[in-house]
């Protein structure tokens, strides 16, 4: 494989907006009778009329982020999840493409291990054409719970992911028709009509939360690695693994190969931001509650990834370890809230310490008021982002 190095300034940082699009009406009392928040919590708690309002609010936030100066918008998908009303990242990306004009659209990402790769390739190519070449295609394995939901053995997840990745790239770069004799996705005839606008294909990013294997895989392919909210010390360890692997592959990685996601909110005063920011703890107690065999079934993660997971404190999405307090999460720069001046100072620290080329702002959670989120987006665009780009 020939890797084409990316080129970026050593100090330039791009800032992306992200929302899980939560169904923020769920409470601890709603969840209390159920063993698991994903496997057992029923959709009788879902109100389509309320969801209609929420979806339109989230789309308005996308449009506002585009207007005030965010470089991109990140989206994702999850299944059987009240904290993420996005069962299809491609549907959400289509909406983003129509309500925005300038921003890149980073899809982190398509769960290609559990879906038809040819259909994924066609849909992403279609989105790239609709958006005018603004798509960044992120590929993910899917969570362990989603693997179980799909009726697929967790031990096959990574192998399926790697085959699906190779097939998608072939669909984008090889004229059809052709055959694909894969173990998991055999096709006698493939002849995709729609191909991406970007050549040879849209940029590919790979996200992760702590698995060394994921970092190594991303580096071997020359793909930027996006760390989704691990603590800074672990994130720097993962970045070192990326650098070591990149050197083995013959290229020198820069900031353009690394991004970092953190929960972040800006308000007019520190006091107001602190109050609103506590909503980031909405999923702390119940997001992945349930039997360990649902959230971490045997074979889904390597022993090394499991060792790392068990040794670190919980920051909102884990199932093992000591849970951190709101104050500790802020001290660790995992949650950043405050006035523009406070947030600028904290993000400058992260930028200097981690040197990411991309900062991904997880800016909405639970039942945060739409007006507060819109104000946060505005303050990011008018105050915070310009300051980060001046450095």
Where are these regions (language model features)?
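Acidic (Asp/Glu)-rich catalytic clusters
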Residues: 63-67, 93-102, 124, 128-135, ...
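Active-site mouth loops of central-metabolism enzymes
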Residues: 40-56, 110-118, 200-210, 264-267, ...
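An alpha-helical appendage that flanks or caps ligand/catalytic pockets
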Residues: 5-11, 16-46, 158-193, 234-356, ...
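N-terminal beta1-alpha1-beta2 module of alpha/beta enzyme domains
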Residues: 2-99, 202
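Conserved, mostly hydrophobic/aromatic
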Residues: 15, 65, 77, 96, ...
